[in-house]
UniProtKB/Swiss-Prot annotation:
Belongs to the YejK family. PANTHER family: NUCLEOID-ASSOCIATED PROTEIN YEJK, PTHR38772. This is Nucleoid-associated protein CGSHiEE_07855. Keywords: Cytoplasm. Pfam families: NA37. Coiled coil: none annotated. GO terms for cellular component: bacterial nucleoid; cytoplasm.
C-alpha cells in the first residue's frame, strides 16, 4: 500500500554549549520539499517503521500552544511552512532544557493513508558511513537514519477534526531509554496521556473471565471461550486491526441471555468500542507464564491440574511429561556430572 504525501519539510536542530548550559539552535528551510519519488519512498519507510513501534496515546491539553497553531493550520489561517518553522523553534526551546539533547533533523509531513490524513513529526539522527565514488575512491558520507528512530509522534487529523471527544488521535513512541524521552516530546506538543491500551486489554481479560463466571461455565467451557477470544484478537493483531468489541461479542456464545457487549456495558468495565490489542497481555487468555530467579515458565492454561499440578502450600509445580528437548538436555547434563 502506498501513501500520498501532501506537504513535507525538513529543519535541523543543532546543539551548542553556552557555558555549562545547552542551547539548541534552529536551522530552518525557507521552502517545502518537492514531492519526488525519493521523498515518497522515504515517507513510506518512515510510516511503516512507525507502525511497528510500541506507541502510547495522547490528547492535547487545553492550553497547548502547538495545538493552537495546528488548529490555525487546519483552518488555513497559516501555511504549512510557517507552522513547521514555529514548531521547530518550539521544540528547540523545550529540548534545550535537557542534558541529553542532541542535534538532529526534524521532519514534518502531512500525508494521507487509507483515506485518513496524518501529521507525522520525528527527530531523526544522522549516521556516518563510507561510499565509493565514480573514480572508485573511498569517501566519508553522512546519511539520515530512517530505520532507527525513537522520537516521533503522529496526529490523526481526520479523527481530530471529526471526533472532538477522541482519546486516541495522537500517538507517540514509547522510548526505550526511559520516560524522559516521551516526557519532553509530550511537553513540546502540550499533550497528556489519552487511551491506555494496556489497561483496556487487562479490563477486557477481566471482563471475559467474569462473563464466563456469571454464565456458570465449567473449566473446559471457560477455556474454550477464552481461546475463542484469543483467536479473534490474534487475528485482529495480525491484520493490524483493533479489537472491535461488538464484533468480538457477536462471535461469542450468549450466556444467561446476555451478549458479552451488553454484559460489559452493564458492569461498567469502561471498555472502548475499539481497543488496540497488546499481544503480551492477550497471551494470558490461554497461557500461564512467568520468570524470576533464573527460571522462565510458560504453559497452556488447559494443562493446569492435568499434566501440571500446583501446590500453593509448598509453592511447587509438578510437571508430568517434560518436553522432549528439555528432557534431552537434562539427561545430557546428568550424564556429564557422572
Amino acid at each position: 500500500m502506498s501513501i500520498t504525501v501532501n506537504q513535507i519539510v525538513l529543519h535541523q536542530l543543532v546543539k551548542n554549549m553556552d557555558g555549562d548550559s545547552i542551547k539548541m539552535e534552529s536551522v530552518l528551510r525557507d521552502e517545502l520539499l518537492s514531492i519526488t519519488p525519493e521523498v515518497e519512498q522515504m515517507m513510506l519507510q518512515l510510516h511503516q517503521g512507525y507502525q511497528n513501534k510500541a506507541k502510547a496515546f495522547g490528547v492535547f491539553q487545553e492550553k497547548s500552544i502547538f495545538a493552537q497553531h495546528l488548529n490555525r493550520l487546519l483552518e488555513q489561517e497559516i501555511e504549512f511552512l510557517g507552522f513547521s518553522q514555529y514548531s521547530t523553534k518550539l521544540l528547540a526551546d523545550e529540548l534545550g532544557k535537557y542534558n541529553f539533547a542532541e542535534s538532529g533533523t526534524l521532519i514534518l509531513c502531512q500525508y494521507n493513508f487509507l483515506a485518513t490524513d496524518y501529521l507525522f513529526i520525528a527527530l531523526l539522527d544522522s549516521r556516518h558511513s563510507m561510499l565509493v565514488d565514480e573514480h572508485l575512491d573511498i569517501r566519508r558520507t553522512e546519511y539520515l537514519d530512517i530505520t532507527q528512530f525513537d522520537i516521533a509522534a503522529r496526529i490523526n487529523l481526520t479523527d481530530l477534526q471529526v471526533n472532538a471527544n477522541s482519546n486516541r488521535y495522537l500517538t507517540f513512541i514509547k522510548g526505550r531509554v526511559g520516560r524522559k524521552i516521551s516526557d519532553f516530546f509530550m511537553d513540546f506538543l502540550g499533550a497528556e496521556e489519552g487511551l491506555n491500551p494496556q489497561v483496556q486489554n487487562q479490563c477486557l481479560l477481566q471482563a471475559v473471565s467474569d462473563y464466563c463466571d456469571q454464565g456458570e461455565l465449567n473449566k473446559e467451557q471457560t477455556q474454550a471461550v477464552k481461546k475463542q477470544v484469543f483467536e479473534y484478537c490474534k487475528g485482529q493483531l495480525s491484520n493490524g486491526n483493533n479489537i472491535e468489541l461488538r464484533e468480538l461479542s457477536d462471535s461469542l456464545p450468549t450466556l444467561n441471555e446476555q451478549p458479552f457487549v451488553v454484559f460489559t456495558e452493564e458492569q461498567n468495565y469502561g471498555l472502548e468500542e475499539s481497543i488496540p490489542p497488546i499481544r503480551s497481555t492477550l497471551k494470558s487468555l490461554t497461557k500461564f507464564s512467568g520468570s524470576g530467579k533464573g527460571v522462565t515458565l510458560s504453559f497452556d492454561a488447559e494443562l493446569l491440574n492435568t499434566r501440571i499440578q500446583w501446590d500453593p502450600m509448598t509453592d511447587t509445580l509438578t510437571i508430568k511429561g517434560l518436553p522432549p528437548n528439555l528432557k534431552d538436555q537434562l539427561q545430557k547434563a546428568l550424564q556429564s556430572e557422572n
